[in-house]
Regions:
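Extended beta-strand/beta-hairpin segments
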Residues: 1-18, 22-105
Length: 105
């Protein structure tokens, strides 16, 4: 849910989510290329969980959902995705619980 309540616009948290999804996808693509897997399609979204406490708002969670199709074994894609989850620079900078859901098609 955006802070703009139906009006056009994007808030900083949505931009962080978009950056996280893009960074993860790029990291996953790079890791797979290192494994010799180059014919893939990666689509990733990130859902940011924003909580309010006495000190203000805090990003508590980031949930990545990625769908990968291509010429690799699902186990190779899964392993690369787990590595990308913790290895992408945006994941490293977030002080939040990061979860990942991978679908291989």
């Amino acid at each position: 849910k955006t802070r703009f309540e139906g009006a056009p616009g994007t808030n900083p948290e949505e931009l962080i989510g978009a950056a996280h999804a893009a960074c993860f996808s790029m990291a996953l693509s790079n890791i797979l290329a290192g494994e010799g897997v180059t014919d893939v399609r990666i689509e990733t979204t990130s859902k940011i969980g924003l909580d309010q406490d006495a000190g203000g708002f805090t990003i508590k969670t980031a949930h990545l959902t990625t769908t990968v199709s291509g010429n690799a074994e699902p186990s190779v894609i899964e392993a690369a995705a787990r590595k990308a989850e913790t290895g992408c620079p945006v994941s490293k900078v977030l002080n939040a619980q990061i979860t990942l859901e991978v679908t291989v098609v």
